[in-house]
A protein has these predicted regions:
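Domain-level recognition of soluble alpha/beta enzyme cores
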Residues: 1-104, 308-311, 322, 331
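Alpha/beta-hydrolase-fold serine-hydrolase catalytic core, especially in secreted/extracellular enzymes
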Residues: 3-6, 11, 24, 47, ...
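Short, solvent-exposed loop/turn and secondary-structure capping segments
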Residues: 31, 51-55, 116-119, 142-146, ...
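Active-site machinery of serine-nucleophile hydrolases
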Residues: 43-47, 57-64, 69, 115-158, ...
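Short substrate-entry loop that stabilizes the transition state in hydrolases
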Residues: 84-144, 255-259
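The feature captures the conserved acid-bearing segment of alpha/beta-hydrolase catalytic domains
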Residues: 96-98, 224-289
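Alpha/beta-hydrolase active-site loop
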Residues: 138-198
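Primarily recognizes the serine-hydrolase "nucleophile elbow" in alpha/beta-hydrolase
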Residues: 179-243
């Protein structure tokens, strides 16, 4: 049986492109002989029934991912994971619009592929955003460059022995400004760059990608709003703040954290957020709960026993709160869900407002 991602909630069909970028002016921090080369999936509102179904993962990437996690052949084979049905279409025609769409950059967790945020990306695009998910080279289990070249993971061996994980979020805070230059600058690398409203840009990330969101905001004033989903702030927020820009902190259930994993970075960095801010936790959600993995795990009978919230419900909450946050702060659309607890979402606990 083929797995399938949840359908987007927005009004628009979704198109998807792949864009391989090379920064000729910056060497890769993990492979110094190579130029830095982010690989993007770009999602946008599209005309329905144009293009062809977009694949989820390349088989070599799926195999590398499952092998690294010790799940190869145990719960799912690479071909099944790669064949997961998405709700975006390659080669689709962009939806004509008199207005441009805000841009949102999504950065995945460490060792995770950009595909792990596909459910969120498709939903945001269906609501009227251009979304760029980013594979940061040599930081995931395998990045398949167009043409078939596989970039294997190199970063872990360099940051874990000496505890220098902040190098990852610091490096991504350099990746994203380059991506913005190539998407919104005078020499755009994307054929549909005209769709982007460069005056309204947001960034969200999972785990270390969430830490990269605040680090990028500190480095680049073009990013107007940010979201950290369950990520330790490895790169501290500057004491002077983020220029009064809004920031959402959305985390898993603290009761599910191992006792030997204290994380005070959210408390430590909260006072430095000097704009609109919220800190929320989701009861029953584990660390992967803000990605596609729990949804797909439920479908193959591999649900983590210590994370009782279903994958479907985890994604409903993630898409609702992240989407409403960007609607409010990039498009000026009221989002009462963010004002306080609601009976419709009893799992969501407001810790700070």
């Amino acid at each position: 049986m083929t797995s399938e991602l949840p359908r987007p909630n927005g009004a628009f069909a979704v198109g998807r492109d792949t864009l391989h970028l090379v920064d000729r002016e910056r060497k890769d921090p993990w492979v110094p002989t190579a130029d830095r080369e982010p690989l993007l999936s770009l999602y946008c509102p599209a005309l329905a029934h144009t293009g062809t179904p977009a694949p989820y993962l390349a088989v070599p990437k799926a195999k590398a991912l499952l092998t690294d996690r010790g799940q190869l052949g145990e719960h799912v084979i690479p071909e099944r994971l790669a064949a997961t049905r998405t709700h975006s279409r390659s080669g689709a025609s962009p939806r004509p619009s008199a207005e441009r769409y805000p841009l949102i950059v999504l950065s995945p967790g460490f060792t995770m592929p950009r595909a792990s945020l596909t459910t969120l990306a498709e939903d945001l695009a269906s609501r009227g955003y251009v979304v760029a998910t980013v594979d940061h080279a040599y930081e995931s289990d395998g990045t398949v460059i167009p043409g078939g070249r596989l970039l294997t993971r190199k970063a872990c061996e360099q940051v874990f022995p000496d505890g220098s994980l902040h190098r990852v979020s610091d490096g991504r805070a350099r990746d994203v400004p380059f991506v913005l230059d190539r998407l919104t600058g005078p020499r755009s690398a994307w054929r549909y760059s005209r769709l982007i409203d460069s005056r309204h840009i947001g960034m969200a990330g999972h785990s270390i990608g969430g830490a990269a969101a605040s680090a990028t905001m500190a480095a680049d004033p073009r990013v107007d709003a940010g979201v950290n989903t369950d990520g330790t702030f490895l790169t501290p927020i500057p004491q002077g703040g983020l220029g009064a820009r809004p920031f959402l902190m959305l985390a898993g259930d603290p009761a599910l954290l191992p006792p030997d994993f204290p994380d005070t970075s959210w408390e430590d960095n909260w006072p430095h957020l000097d704009g609109w801010k919220r800190r929320l936790t989701v009861t029953g959600a584990g660390h992967p709960g803000f990605t596609d993995w729990p949804v797909l795990g439920d479908q193959v009978g591999y649900s983590h026993p210590e994370t009782p919230l279903s994958g479907t419900r985890s994604q409903q909450i993630t898409r609702a709160y992240v989407g409403d946050f960007f609607d409010r702060h990039l498009r000026g659309i009221p989002a009462p869900r963010l004002d306080g607890p609601t009976a419709a979402d009893p799992e969501v606990v407001f810790h700070r407002r």
